[in-house]
Amino acid sequence: MKSLWLHGAAIVTATGSDPEQAGILLEAGRIARIGGAAPRGVEVVDCAGLTLTPGLIDAHVHLGMASPILDSVGYGMSVAEIAADMFANCARTLRTGFTTVRDCGGIDAGLVGVVASGKIAGPRIVQCGPIHCQTGGHGHYASEWEPAGLWSGQEIPGLRTLAMLADNPDEMRRNARESFRRGADFLKLCVTGGVISKHDKLTDTQFTSEEIAAAVAEATARGTYVTVHAHNVAGIRNAVLAGVRCVEHGTGIDEETAALMAERGVSLVPTLAAVEAVIRNGLGLPSEFAERAAQVRQAMVDGLLAAKAAGVRIGLGSDVIGPDQSRRGEELTLRAAVESPMEALIAATRVNAGLLGLDSEIGTLEVGKRADIVGFAGNPLEDPKLFADPESVVLVLRNGVIVS
């Protein structure tokens, strides 16, 4: 692996320090030095006019849902088409500056393996395998006339399994063990209704405390954790009291619930971009889903602010689904409007790295860290709309190798 000197850019380290003009020396896939002069004989990469940040991390993706939604979950397209869309989505995700992702439901470890091997381009992937849901709950996408016994989670072995059903603690325990057998890094449960749900309401709570606790016990036994999809306070509290360590979406979190999350060390990953995408273009779905998205938009922001005030660790995830996931960076733009551009960037880098347990390796531009670096044409801290524009990402390095 050749050494590189990145020259002429403004550097945003995401450590909390102000941006600075400095060169970066990359050796053996890691950051060897920041500042000083270029060593003799090293290859120089001209980064004049760019802003360099740590590689972005999306803590809530669905790489396996990269096709038209209704066709993809209803046998409306071939396995070959689904696979092609997934592979293209992986490459696009990396190209737009996301060097690491946490997949929150749908892919199998086989996809992780082919990306890690270099057979297809893509980000570093941490994944939960299939979503865990109850019969008729969020994630059970079967039509109402389809017998529940026929549901297999749209399983494509080695590529994609959307969801597994459990209706008692023993079934949850078996499904959790099966997920880990297949290579899951953590577990995700749906504990409330969802925006894109056929059979439930946003106000529904799902899974009993005993069912959630069974999943938590299996994850804890393996040194990992459970995160939950949650759009109402009752579901969030049930999950937190059962021992989960992270909440996705977090719609409607109030002060009391935020305090409980902070006390128990539970993190939050809001997903504003997915809500905006459903409201803006519908994703080819029935109009009722856009109406649901409109219901959660402000409540999710309110939950974020309540959690922030309580001192909850807050990551960043896009949750975008469907054929066009190129604008997942819009999550940073939306967060910048709620907080600040720097806070949004730090959430998408340093905070997310900690949430994934990778903060010793990635998340900041520091000596010794892996050289995952993104170059923006312009300064997204001054113009946060650049985060949402994939064309503004003009340089991507992963492990010290230029990939875009």
Ranges and model annotations:
Residues 12-13, 348-350, 354, 367-404:
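C-terminal cap of metal-dependent C-N hydrolases
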